[in-house]
Amino acid sequence: MRILLSNDDGYFAPGLAALAEALDGLGEVVVVAPEQNRSGASNSLTLDRPLLLKKAATGFYFVNGTPTDCVHLAVTGMLDKLPDIIVSGINLGANMGDDTIYSGTVAAATEGYLLGIPSIAISMTSFEGNNFASAARVARELVERFIRNPISEPVLLNVNVPDISYSDLKGTEVTRLGRRHKAEPVVKMQSPRNETVYWVGAAGAAADAGPGTDFNAVERGFVSITPLQIDLTHSAQLSHIDQWMK
């Protein structure tokens, strides 16, 4: 069993270290992660310059690129044998609803899925990071389940774990993505050089957080597991747009 790990918070992130430690012993664990924090990088690839692959004292490999770069490089150019599963995380902060479009954590797992490898993105639903051990244990249980009962087709799972102790988790729920309200406006500030600068605003609050959503599950103390797909076709609008074009 070969397990490839990546993230978007960078190879130095405590969530990645906790994940690697938790999965140790389940197989050969290889870590390839960004050199810097690349949160919000989505599925971007670096096409305007070469990528450098280096090895840290921890044994983790790091790349001067995006999370997608890391997985793509590892799978198509670095590893002599394909990983059996890819796990991305543990992200500091939730990746629910619309977050999945922007998330580098989800993107790393998505790249694995596109390359035909079962992939999991796992995030902790706060920015405090008090309970990485809980999310790490959830990740181990999912990988153990995969080892015992492999899924016949590549799968892409988005997992969100409440930032509480493992004993306080209520269980797991398979969910759909909820929706957020539109993001908060950018924040305008003056730099020390008296330049006007802008920071991207916070994500919008939950708009669709009803039963069955990822938002609803984690709010009630459950681990949310959402199977994702790549097809962005709005099937319900096909006939409408077809008529509109005539």
From Swiss-Prot:
GO terms for cellular component: cytoplasm. A divalent metal cation binds at D8, D9, S39, N91. Its cofactor is a divalent metal cation. It holds the Pfam family SurE. Keywords: Cytoplasm, Hydrolase, Metal-binding, Nucleotide-binding. GO terms for molecular function: 3'-nucleotidase activity; 5'-nucleotidase activity; exopolyphosphatase activity; metal ion binding; nucleotide binding. The keyword Nucleotide-binding applies. It comes from the Bacteria. InterPro entries: SurE (IPR030048), SurE-like_Pase/nucleotidase (IPR002828), SurE-like_sf (IPR036523). It catalyses: a ribonucleoside 5'-phosphate + H2O = a ribonucleoside + phosphate. Belongs to the SurE nucleotidase family. HAMAP family: SurE. Nucleotidase that shows phosphatase activity on nucleoside 5'-monophosphates. This is 5'-nucleotidase SurE. It comes from Dechloromonas aromatica (strain RCB). The lineage of its organism: Bacteria, Pseudomonadati, Pseudomonadota, Betaproteobacteria, Rhodocyclales. The gene is surE.
